[in-house]
Amino acid sequence: MLQRVSRRFPSLRRCGLRTASTVPTNQAQPGEVEEEVSATVKRIRSELAADKQKLKWRTPIGDRPEDWNSKLKLFSNAEQTSDFIVMMQKPIDLSPRNIRQWWENREERIERHMQQFVPERHKILGAELAAAHFILYRGGAVKFINDTHWRRASKDGEFKLPNKFDPRYKVEALRCDNMELYYEGLENLRCLDSLKFLSFHNVKSFDDWCLDRISGGGFPNLEVLDLSCTQITSNGLACLYRFPKLKLLILNDPKETLELELSTVMLEEAMPALKIVGADAIHS
């Protein structure tokens, strides 16, 4: 019946279609949605750019257009640190003591730079030989697996080691005693899977930060660690849990302070195979 009515009144059907097309709805057209989204994205981006501009650090003095610049600015240090600023604010002191201190600080900065990790050296030599070259060049001693003696550099600083990777050389022990070794240079001691003995006896610059770096160097088989005559405190001993096979730890005096004694007792309790002794029992 409805079909007959629709055939009899075709005009009514056309009118209904026109009415439906003109009735307002809550759904937006696809083009309108895209325009609204793009406008919102543009607004958010503009707000983020404005916020970044507000949060940006102030322009350094001398880089602003209204600042006066001297011709000597060509010789200024672009990376001026707080130490440099403090130095420039101090009165000029040309006393022998101050000149000697300045020279020592300069030599230390140069040595720290020279001890930095060189990726190319490790790519050519491998981790084992790269560590051996680094230690021998600075007056240390190295012992490889199946070697019957320690290897040291001659008086002229020369030593015989391969100048490219050789899988037969596996470092078993390292002696860094009395060396001038800094935090930057410790990164050269890494991934020594066969290392069992490591000594930093009388390395004055070796502190808790250095021990933390060494503990993350990847020495899974380390058994003996000598930290006597260094700047190690009770705070640095907490990272020794990273040496699961550590059996002997040498310190100046495990009972030097109450904090150090408590730390050593807790460390021995956490690592039953570990024995902590004083330097007098080893280096006497």
Curated annotation (Swiss-Prot):
GO BP field: mitochondrial respiratory chain complex I assembly
Record-given protein name: Distal membrane arm assembly component 2
Gene Ontology CC annotation, any one: mitochondrion
Role summary: Involved in the assembly of the mitochondrial membrane respiratory chain NADH dehydrogenase (Complex I).
Gene this chain is encoded by: Dmac2
Subunit relationships: Associates with mitochondrial complex I assembly intermediates during its biogenesis.
InterPro entries per record: LRR_dom_sf
Family the UniProt entry places it in: Belongs to the ATP synthase subunit s family.
